[in-house]
Amino acid sequence: MKLLIYLFILTFYKTIVLTQTPSTHLDVDITIYDQLPLYNNNFEPETGSLTKNLVQTTLGSDGLPVLNSYSNLTYSNKNGRMYSPELFKYFFAPNQISNTTFNCGRNFPIKKQLKLLRTASGNYIYDNDFFFPIDYEGFDTDPANRIYKDDESTNKTYHNYHFCFQFDNRFLFKGNETFKFTGDDDVWVFINKQLVVDLGGTHPAASSSVDLSTLGLTVGKVYPFNFFYCERHTSRSTIRIETSLELYCDKYDYCGVCNGDGSTCCNPITDCNDDDLCTNDVCPPSDTVIDPSLPISFYCQHHPTPDPLVSDKCFESVCNSTTGSWFLNATICVEKEGLINTGCDGNTGCIYEPPTQTPTETPTQTPTETPSQTPTETPSQTPTETPSQTPTCTQHPTPTPTCTEHIKTPKPTPTPTCTKHPKPTPTCTEHTKTPKPTKTLKPTPTPKPTQTPKVPQCGKCEKLSSCKTYCEKKDCDDCQRELDGYKFDRCKTYSCDPIKGCIKTDKCKQGNDPCLKPVCNQYTGFCSQERVVSDKCKCDDKGKKGFGLGIGIGINA
């Protein structure tokens, strides 16, 4: 029963669509991508000619044309003036970036509409021999970019000659529709995702037509219609579309563009900037439902930037949100009861082991010696030592002293010795009296705990020595590790302040000229200067573009 109802509704819908009275005009929403030859050298190349086979015969997975080759040495790319094939992806897709360097691929999306008028023949037509829809718009809001003129005219009229546009519509196939096009430069038309019009390259106006009855389409079925057009060279821009297709839009983005991507009303740089250089700011997905009372920034997304460093479980990658730079911090191994941290493994992390058991000297472990075995010493045999000769165990600021374990009665000797005490950690006992003659060993009672030497308190610019018995002065390397871990910032100078402790300051300092700001190369540490263009900068050459260069080498000490 449900199937019958569905078939009835579908038949009713098709009947209405097929029999409804056609409109006097057909409005087609388009997205124009303004281009600038500075940012994409595929625009304003040398004069070319009509070139087929620039693109593949099927649309890519993103619904856009795909070049047959991404080498600029192939015949089709050379003849079609595709100097930088890798930038072709920005012909019909947004690339709103802050980069303004040569061939960065930057473009400027703009929403427009084509109005096709219905003629007496029943076809819809758009005909324009001077197709310049974005003069003074996009990049050309800046007068410095209005440098391209109509060289064929006597008055050298300015126009915006560098742009591409595309639209993505649907149509219900009736069985006898046609599509005709005349224009320049590149034009590609795809019906049901298959290439049916192929007029690539920079060329004078060229024509192509399609009889849809020859494409193997099914009457009454809805198909996609994708149109792609580029104007890449002065001095003309021609376009003529004639079709009997009843094109319509099946969905709109939040900017009101048919099957748009949201780029005509959302710029990630200006609308989504969260001032965090450790995130990639993007506009919301095109199908996002936007509350008109809220700003577009409320719906922006902020994705963490990929970690460029090779980190493991012993080092953690950290990004500075102010500078966007990454550095490594050593993993801090927490203390665990009953275990000792012995290091770190990059795959498993912190390594813990039980403490080493120190042998305890008990009466049963002490060898029993008879008087005949025990060497007897008379006072004459006992070396007399003055206080200055008293053997002492002195701790020096060198590697931790090693204690020698004696299991037999030591013979008298002027050499200082360290007695092993039954504690987990070996310590050195200081002897200040002359040893008496050794008698027969008896079970030794458990000694009292030896007091641990007091750890000195170091100042802000001091650190404990390796044996933790005295303080040493911190150097710049100590401060660098304290402040930034294992990441050395070449643009900072590390030092120690007696009150504040370790500090770092900018290596590159502001000079006397307020219109030249210091710039540091984070890879080399070299200092240079850039000219400031600002209303607050009162200079004779205010507003002029340029740069100053100065090189300085700062050495951390």
Swiss-Prot record:
> Mind naming one GO cellular-component term on file for this protein?
extracellular region
Q: What happens when the gene is disrupted?
A: Cells appear to develop normally; however, conditioned medium from these mutants show reduced prespore-cell-inducing activity. Conditioned medium from mutant show no cell division inducing activity.
Which UniProt key words apply to this protein?
A: Developmental protein, Differentiation, Glycoprotein, Growth factor, Secreted, Signal
The cross-references to InterPro entries, in alphabetical order and at most eight, read: Fibro_Slime, PA14/GLEYA, PA14_dom, Prespore-cell_inducing_factor
Enumerate the glycosylated residues: 72, 99, 155, 176, 320, 329
As for PTM, the annotation reads: N-glycosylated.
Extent of the signal sequence: 1-19
Task: Quote the subcellular location field of this record.
Answer: Secreted
User: Region Disordered: what ranges?
Assistant: 355-451
Keyword Signal belongs to the record:
yes
Q: Does the keyword Glycoprotein apply?
A: yes
Q: Which terms does the record give in the GO molecular function aspect?
A: growth factor activity
GO biological process entries: cell differentiation; negative regulation of sorocarp stalk cell differentiation; positive regulation of sorocarp spore cell differentiation
Tell me which residues make up the PA14 domain: 116-261
Q: How does it assemble?
A: Homodimer.
Sequence similarity: Belongs to the prespore-cell-inducing factor family.
Q: What does this protein do?
A: Growth factor that can induce isolated amoebae to differentiate into prespore cells.
Q: State the name under which the record lists this protein.
A: Protein psiA
**Source organism of the structure:** Dictyostelium discoideum (Social amoeba)
Q: What is the lineage of its organism?
A: Eukaryota, Amoebozoa, Evosea, Eumycetozoa, Dictyostelia
